[in-house]
């Protein structure tokens, strides 16, 4: 769901989806289901096609699942390896308190090269006041990479980590590390 304000669909409603757009992407990873769907109106996705790319890329089934951090009722960060590939997807969802993560990508294969695309809450994102604020960062990652990310209140982040198939994919990209 990319449209959080239900008043736009039903003017008499004051309902609100308690989530940021980045958190909605993360749910594709944190909540396992081999039957995924895009549950919003097509025109709402069309407004955010850069973020919709994550939904197009995310796998439906997994060879490996790892829970990188969690505190019940506060946050969860899961990493899942797409079945039959070397591609990984990470999702973090947080409560209304938000969450700061330090992610070590040491589960990646040291013999492979990867490109990560991070879909994260923007600095001013908030599930109540600015749920559609997000940033996208893309760069090269390895098992030595450490990323620091902040999930806004009611927010999260999603990361696709794709194995490099052709060195040309690396052109113009820099290493991702530190604060995202």
State the predicted function of each range.
Residues 1-42, 69-70, 120:
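Glycan-recognition surfaces
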Residues 3-7, 37-39, 46-48, 97-100, ...:
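Flexible loop/turn segments at secondary-structure boundaries
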Residues 30, 90, 154:
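Conserved, mostly hydrophobic/aromatic
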Residues 34-45, 64-66, 102, 115:
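Acidic/polar loop patches that form or flank catalytic/metal-binding clefts of enzymes
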Residues 43-89, 124-130:
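Glycan-recognition and catalytic regions of carbohydrate-active enzymes
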Residues 72-115, 119, 157-160:
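Carbohydrate-binding surface patches
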Residues 118-144:
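Solvent-exposed beta-strand/loop surfaces of large extracellular or lumenal domains
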Residues 138-180:
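C-terminal beta-strand-rich structural cap/linker in extracellular carbohydrate-active enzymes
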């Amino acid at each position: 769901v990319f449209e959080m304000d239900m008043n736009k669909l039903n003017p008499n409603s004051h309902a609100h989806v308690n989530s940021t757009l980045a958190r909605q992407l993360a749910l594709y990873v944190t909540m396992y289901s081999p039957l995924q769907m895009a549950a919003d109106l097509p025109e709402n996705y069309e407004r955010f096609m850069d973020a919709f790319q994550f939904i197009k890329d995310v796998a439906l089934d997994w060879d490996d699942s790892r829970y990188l951090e969690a505190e019940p009722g506060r946050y969860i960060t899961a990493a899942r390896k797409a079945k039959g590939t070397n591609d990984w997807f990470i999702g973090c969802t947080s409560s209304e308190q938000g969450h700061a993560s330090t992610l070590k990508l040491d589960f990646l294969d040291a013999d492979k090269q990867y490109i990560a695309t991070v879909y994260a809450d923007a600095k001013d994102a908030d599930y109540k006041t600015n749920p559609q604020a997000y940033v996208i960062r893309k760069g090269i990652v390895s098992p030595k990479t450490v990323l620091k990310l902040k999930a806004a209140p009611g927010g999260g982040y999603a990361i696709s980590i794709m194995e490099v198939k052709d060195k040309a994919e690396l052109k113009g990209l820099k290493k991702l590390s530190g604060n995202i």
